[in-house]
């Protein structure tokens, strides 16, 4: 009976709403969206405290830094006050979270902590960790005094290239890969200790290709979503078909000490549902990797290049029970400008249900961000691209867009 109820709840969650939503968003029945902020520029992740929203930003090389954007909302969820702080220091890092009365925010090379009080803009700050390898640095906390910082493998590189490889030859990966000493993993730090160096951190997990999505699931553990490799069919058409390349998924992993997610030596085959050796390391596109040190994904996103850029577990009480403990995922959408029938994948918000501590199959939660037609799901035509998700104190879900800097608040008004 419980299994049936769970299936029905998740099926209902994928049904479109009857009421018109702003920007043509398509939501499950009983859910409604409201635009709470707009024209914020190239924003990334969000952190919420009461009626305040703190937003991390990314800007181009020729654009001025805007640091962290702070918004104070009125009871009707309209902006009362807007300010900026951390300009030139706490930006370009993506990760941002409110934790134990403070705001933690990543820059490209450090983690900053701002003391929060009744004022919107904090006046006191510390550097918790500095000297990090340049990266996005999503962050998470375990409730036991530990701060987790993710550092990707290097801009989504498929391998750890051997510089001695001739330019006209196929890429060859270094083994062992020296990059794994300083990136492609998760490092653990003391959340309260000021002035830590990168070298003070504990190398907690390894094997990340590219990731901006990291969060702690209450009563469970740390989870990360990794971007699957691309361009494999183009480089090795004799080993991997384009269909097999397109089926290489983004993967959600449950992280424990010494977890190895496989980069750069291996990748997850979405067709065969097995781990394969990367062609740069002698892989033939079909022989499974049997080494038990590589962990299996907890869930996979079978969408071609969806660009999963944020992850938040739902611990609120506003949404129906079937959502509690599950994960909302911001799918930014692939960067390939080519228009394909039916549009590119991503450009939406997905939901990963959990039952008995196990992740289920991801389902679409919010659609329509790119525009009214499937062809809008393209980097050149998309109106909006989800880049961040966060849960407010009242249990509403907030979604951030990187194209125009818009933020929606999604609430539930249906039956419990």
Model-inferred region functions:
Residues 39-51, 87-102, 106, 131-147, ...:
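Beta-rich, blade/repeat-based domains predominating
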Residues 66-69, 110-112, 185-187, 251, ...:
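A short loop-to-beta-strand structural motif that recurs across blades of beta-propeller domains
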